[in-house]
Amino acid sequence: MFMKSGDDIPNSFDLSSLRLLGTVGEPINPEVWKWYYKIIGKEKCPIVDTWWQTETGGMMISPLPGLETIPLKPGSATLPVPGIDIAVVDEFGVEVPSNTKGYLIIKNPWPGILLTLWGDDKKYKTVYWSKYTNCYYSGDYALRDNDGYLWLLGRADDVLKIAGHRIGTAELESCIVSDDNVAESAVCGIPDE
């Protein structure tokens, strides 16, 4: 939202004490990432764009501050943290080729993992562990590029069905905010009666 207001507002503040920038919650658009890095971080602060869920108990994908030898890519959450084995798979659980959209899964249990849902162990196993054998199903779309970097593409269940096509809400939101007259957008489906 700051980006659409121009550079004057952030440039009117002394941001020299910043050492690290963070973003979490939704995939970050590469253009926004570049602006954030240049204008807010003054091209000196790494951006820690993390992926995690409450159920994972902590960050699963994140650039690690202090490891500047791993270059950042605008819009990518980078790589799994050490010890986390992530894959991007198709609907049958087969790993997809690089640069192909698929489901983000975690192959093995890890410290901090949610062990059950309060009062509903069956739902926990059904929602998170039954779609792919012995793998945690995140419910998110992602792709892995040729360098192994992960690009989060939004929720798999956050999809609109329009004229026989499945379109992700995050894709529409990115398209809408590409218009200079739009600061923010949120897309949600409504039933077609």
Regions flagged by a language model, labelled:
Residues 3-72, 85, 93:
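Gly/Ser/Thr-rich phosphate-binding loop
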Residues 17, 83, 123, 181-184:
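Glycine-centered tight turns that cap/initiate beta-strands
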Residues 21, 52, 104, 148, ...:
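Hydrophobic, well-ordered secondary-structure elements that form the walls
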Residues 25, 52, 78, 140, ...:
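Active-site glycine-centered loops adjacent to acidic/histidine catalytic or metal-binding residues
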Residues 69-76, 127-128:
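Short, P/G- and charge-enriched loop/turn segments at secondary-structure junctions
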Residues 79-83, 94-128, 167:
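Conserved ATP/PPi-binding loop(s) of AMP-dependent carboxylate-activating enzymes
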Residues 85, 90-94, 101, 146-147, ...:
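Residue-level recognition of short loop/turn positions
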Residues 110, 115-116, 126, 134, ...:
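AMP-binding/adenylate-forming catalytic core of the ANL superfamily
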